C-alpha cells in the first residue's frame, strides 16, 4: 500500500503545472487546435485565415482558413 502513496504523489507532482510554463496546458491547447482543423501561428494569422483560439499561454494563435 505504501507504494501507491508514493506513485500518487509522483504523478501529482508531474501533473501540476509550473507557474509561467504551463507545459501540459500548452500541449492540450495545441492538440485541441489541430482537432478543430487549425494550425498554430507564432505572430498572427495569415490574411485568408481567422483566429479560432490560442495554442499556448504565451500568445500563439490558432488559425484556420476562412469558410
Curated annotation (Swiss-Prot):
The keyword Secreted applies. GO terms for molecular function: CCR6 chemokine receptor binding; chemoattractant activity. Residues 1-22 form the signal peptide. It comes from the Eukaryota. Pfam families: Defensin_beta. GO terms for biological process: cell chemotaxis; defense response to bacterium. InterPro entries: Defensin_beta-like. It is found in: Secreted. Belongs to the beta-defensin family. This is Beta-defensin 103A. The gene is DEFB103A.
Amino acid at each position: 500500500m505504501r507504494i501507491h502513496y508514493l506513485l500518487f504523489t509522483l504523478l501529482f507532482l508531474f501533473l501540476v503545472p509550473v507557474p509561467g510554463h504551463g507545459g501540459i496546458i500548452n500541449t492540450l491547447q495545441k492538440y485541441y487546435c489541430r482537432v478543430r482543423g487549425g494550425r498554430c501561428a507564432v505572430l498572427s494569422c495569415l490574411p485568408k485565415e481567422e483566429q479560432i483560439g490560442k495554442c499556448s499561454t504565451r500568445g500563439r494563435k490558432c488559425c484556420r482558413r476562412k469558410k
